[in-house]
Amino acid sequence: MPRKIFHQLFFAGLWLLILASPALDQPLTQTARSWGQDGPGWYWGLAAYWAGLGGLQMAALALWALAAWFLRQWVWLACALGGFAAVVVSGILSQVIKHLMGRPRPRLGLSPLELIGPTLNSDFTSFPSGHAATSFALAAVLAYFYPRGAWLIFLAAAWVGVGRIASGSHFLSDVLGGAVLGLMTGLPLAYGAMRRQGLLQKKLRRYDSA
């Protein structure tokens, strides 16, 4: 199947899940929260907070880019820069959207359909999940550069999303919305980073010879 058609079908499937999720939000969110209550706290804490934290992702990518520079690994460098851009852009977009929508978090016990509009109250910034957005944006870039490990990369991103539900921070549709936002951000940036890899290599070699 051509990659373009696969992407279109993938996005269509995610959007259908989001449209269907109002009926599934409450029961599936409660199920995932029970996992968080019954499972080891460190495991879900790692998934819910640290693994998908944009700042840590950017720090790791910066170290990766630095190592790639010293080792003269241009594919690594292009991937790290593309991933950094994906995390930044998806993170900013998710913050803008969630503060404009004003959706309550599950722990408040309110309906996921109850929106209050623009707000700075963090209790009403549920949609979309910023952790899911940055994780799936980064996953899109990594999978684009390293397709053989795509299933494992996206599994890690999904683990972060489930952790956000298990912690009571998000509904299912928040995570799905964040995943779609992340993929729509990450894939174009991955494509751009891949295409500019040769140009980046030429510029850096010119810099070395100067």
Regions found by a protein language model. Give the residues of each.
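Structural signal for the C-terminal ends of transmembrane alpha-helices
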Residues: 23, 63-74, 143-145, 188-194
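Alpha-helical transmembrane segments in multi-pass membrane proteins
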Residues: 17, 82-86, 90, 94, ...
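Membrane-embedded catalytic cores of phosphoryl/pyrophosphoryl-handling enzymes
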Residues: 2-9, 114-210
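Interfacial segments of alpha-helical transmembrane regions
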Residues: 7-8, 63-95
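Aromatic-anchored segments of alpha-helical transmembrane domains
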Residues: 16-23, 87-93, 157-169
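N-terminal transmembrane-helix/juxtamembrane module of multi-pass inner/ER membrane proteins
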Residues: 1-63, 98-119
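Membrane-helix interface segments
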Residues: 39-40, 72-78, 107, 146-152
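Active-site His/Glu-centered metal-binding helix of metallohydrolases
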Residues: 27, 96-97, 101, 133, ...
